[in-house]
Regions:
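N-terminal metal-binding scaffold of metallo-dependent hydrolase/deaminase domains
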Residues: 1-37, 49
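Short, hydrophobic alpha-helical packing/hinge segments within bilobed ligand-binding/sensory domains
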Residues: 50-51, 129, 142
Length: 144
């Protein structure tokens, strides 16, 4: 399923998707009635839907570790008790080296293939995040 143009959803039933060794889709064709001569690496079941990767257009990377915490607090308390101290800790390259790979790998595992990240005030750890995205294969805009 995809959206080839605005406001138009197309569902492709019973197709063959050809992917090259680099992971790039090179063709999407209707499946022939006889597939015996084809090399099939992976066949999806009849109830499986294949979607393109998801895009997260606004992710504060330093807040990854506090996901779901402090939800009962007013915004100012949440910022000063959770967010700002954590963002300060993530200017440390040792801590960032532990957090960034876990975060990027988790997002990729859940289908998020592109992200616009807000990183830290540290050039070093912001650069580390960009390098992690490149290494793990996630498309990203990384800013601070």
């Amino acid at each position: 399923m995809h959206t080839p143009e605005r406001n138009r959803l197309t569902v492709l039933d019973d197709v063959i998707i050809t992917v090259d060794d680099g992971g790039t889709i090179t063709a999407i064709d209707p499946a022939p009635a006889d597939t015996s001569g084809l090399t099939v690496d992976h066949e999806l079941g009849p109830d499986v839907v294949l979607l393109p990767g998801l895009n997260d257009t606004h992710l504060h990377a330093p807040q990854w570790q506090q996901l779901g915490t402090g939800l009962d607090l007013p915004l100012e308390d949440w910022l000063f008790q959770h967010t700002f101290p954590l963002e300060q800790r993530l200017t440390d390259p040792v801590i960032a080296a532990e957090v960034w790979p876990h975060m990027v790998a988790t997002l990729l595992a859940h289908g998020t293939t592109a992200v616009a990240y807000y990183a830290t005030v540290s050039v070093a750890t912001t650069t580390m995040l960009a390098a992690t995205c490149a290494e793990l294969g996630q498309r990203a805009f990384v800013g601070r």
